[in-house]
Amino acid sequence: MLDNLAANEVRVFLWHHKLSRPDIQEYADICVSAEEKGGLSNICDKRFVEKVSVRVILYKLLGKDVRICYNENGAPYLSNKQYYISISHTDGHFALSFSHRKHGIDIERWNSTAKRVSKMFATEQEVAALVDAKAITDEDAKAFCTIWSAKESIYKSHDFAGLSFRDGILLKKDAFSNLVAEVSYKEATFHYAVEYRLLPDCVLTICLPASV
């Protein structure tokens, strides 16, 4: 049921399904802790499916006693703090990652929206280096989706509240053709490595602080 992907020091578990709220309710009865069930009763069907799907993945891996909690900025963490985690979902794809290091993941279904609104999150320098130069993929729409997803995973990796995707994150390829990022935030500079997987109907990006 779960796809298991390894990326450096991160393990990502993916579940793809098209279950509705009534379909997935039986999973909620089994996999969701009593403490969390109260918070699921009054949310919309889409959010219910997203939250339960991620908790099913967690249950399969660590059991029912471990819960997903959220800090003041909305970032998820495990109740036992055994691992750092990150969560993402898009149109029937649900992802949960684990690592002993802070990190971020994002999954985006292939679409044309990212290309249409690219000026909101990508600079001309990034477009020239990564899209026009075919550094990510031969398909422009997929390249823009990957840039957007990479910046989402970077944002999640460090709780960068208020960070500008366009002006605060610069993506490029290093000398070994790896995707790297420089983040400018509150007069400080951070460096990240981003791994990406071009899947049949979506892109998955995984971000970790760059090794020093």
Which residues fall in each region the model found?
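Core catalytic alpha/beta fold that binds nucleotide/phospho-ligands
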Residues: 1-212
